Regions:
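Amphipathic alpha-helical interaction modules
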Residues: 19-69
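Short amphipathic alpha-helical segments that mediate assembly, nucleic-acid/protein binding
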Residues: 5-6, 22, 45-48, 64, ...
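Conserved mixed alpha/beta catalytic, RNA-binding, or beta-rich assembly cores of soluble enzyme
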Residues: 3-6, 10-14, 18-30, 34, ...
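Amphipathic alpha-helical binding modules
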Residues: 74-110
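Short, hydrophobic/amphipathic alpha-helical patches that form generic packing surfaces
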Residues: 7-14, 50-51, 65-73
Length: 110
C-alpha cells in the first residue's frame, strides 16, 4: 500500500541528501519509530514529522520544505505548496495524511 507514494518520497530524500545521508537519517528515524520511515510518512505524516523535528530541530522544517519543492518541481505533487505541505505535517491526523496521498502521484506524461 502506498508504494508509488513511498517511491516518490524516497526519490526526493535521495536527490536532496544523497544515499549515504539518507541511510543515516533512516537509521535514526526508524530506530525511534520502530519501522520503515516511508511507511510511517504514508500512514501518519504528523508522527513522522514529529520524530524528524526531535532529531533535526528547526532543520526538519527546512528539509521538508525542500522535499515539497522537489516533489512539485519534478511533477510528483500537485496542489500543495511548501507552506501547505508543512501545515499538513504539523497538523497530522488522517485528514492531513489523505490530503498528502491525493497530492503525491506519478507525474503527467507530456
Amino acid at each position: 500500500m502506498g508504494g508509488v507514494f513511498k517511491l516518490f518520497i524516497s526519490r526526493a530524500f535521495e536527490s536532496l541528501l544523497g544515499p549515504t545521508s539518507v541511510m543515516a537519517l533512516r537509521f535514526h528515524v526508524e530506530r525511534r519509530l520502530g519501522r520503515d520511515m516511508y511507511e510511517v510518512f504514508y500512514e501518519d505524516p504528523g508522527r513522522f514529522y514529529k520524530v524528524l523535528r526531535e532529531l533535526l530541530g528547526s532543520g526538519a522544517e527546512m528539509l521538508m520544505r525542500l522535499v515539497a519543492r522537489w516533489l512539485n518541481e519534478n511533477g510528483y505533487m500537485e496542489g500543495l505548496d511548501p507552506d501547505k505541505f508543512i501545515e499538513l505535517l504539523e497538523k497530522g491526523g488522517e485528514e492531513a495524511a489523505e490530503r498528502m496521498r491525493r497530492a503525491i502521484k506519478p507525474p503527467y506524461r507530456r
